[in-house]
Structures are given as C-alpha cells and as structure tokens.
Amino acid sequence: MTNPISGTNVREILAQTVFGAVGNEAMEDLVRVARIEHFKLPTLLSAAGESPTHLRLVISGHVELVTRHISGSEIVVGHIAAGGWVTWLAVFMTQAPTHDFCISASSSCLALPVKDVQSFCVQYPEIYPMVIRMIGHRMRLLIEWTGQSVLASPVQRMAKLLSVLAQEQNRQTDQNGVTLYVTQARLAS
C-alpha cells in the first residue's frame, strides 16, 4: 500500500522492522491502519501524563524526550533518531510516560495506533522476543552507564555517557558514523 499523501510505501517500511518477521500477509492489518506523518514545525506528539495513542517509527528527523526541572524549565533528556521507535512502552504499559515526546521540524514518521499494535502482538506472539531485545538493548546501556558512574570520575562519566548515546543512536540508524544530538543542558541533566 502506498500512503496517498506522501507516496511512501508503508509496507516496505514495515517490512524492514520487527513486523517484517511475520511476513507480508500478517502485516496487512497494520498496513491498513498505518499513516505517514510529516511535521514542518517542531510538534508535541504526546504530553507528559498522557498515554501515547500511536507507536511511531521515526523516518527522518528526530524525537526529543523532554522533562521538566523542579524550577519548571524544560530539559531534553534523550533523542530518538531515524529508525527508532516512539515508544514501545505505550503498547505494553498502562501508566503514562512522565515526559513529553516532541518531534523536530522537517521530520517524518510512520504512525500505528497503539490498540492495533496490541492486537497484532496478541495475534503474533513471536514478535515479543524481538521487541524485548530492542527495549533490552537500551536498558542494558542505561544500567551499564549508571553502574559505572558510581565508580568513575566526572570526566569518565561524561565520556561513558557520550559513548552510550552514540551506541544507541548508531544502532537506530545502522550507520558507521553518527551525528550525536547533544546539548550542554542535556549533558548537565
């Protein structure tokens, strides 16, 4: 199916993800409900305290995870680059995230309704181990950095944090080189 708005082949995009492991015929239900979203301006996808209604695959641009300091100032605590999902936790958890998801200007993503993804996962349980591996990789990096941070100097903690961020972003984009989206505010938080 080609999305009528963009000319993008939704089936081709889904086939390159964990959904492709179940085959074209099984993906048909998701292809029907998928939509390609284009954002010319930075846009709030879902606010803190709200459960996301869609699971999104970032096609171009990036999504920022934004939290608020006790003083009220916003802090970007993470980026999800092209190839990354926003967010599988919406599919499996009933508790809403405590941060905002904001997509950058000139970005595109493939959006799947959470309810349809939940039904798909029930119908094709073989997808669970693949999703767990994706989520587990990011969790392992976070735990590794947290554990090593206790023993390391501030400079070593910063180096490890940059390494973890680059590993995660490189895994999402599947490239050798990576542009790391890091700001002083993000590193300071």
Region spans (language model):
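Cytosolic regulatory regions built on CNB/CRP/Popeye-like sensor folds
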Residues: M1-E168
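Phosphate-/nucleic-acid-contacting segments
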Residues: L165-S189
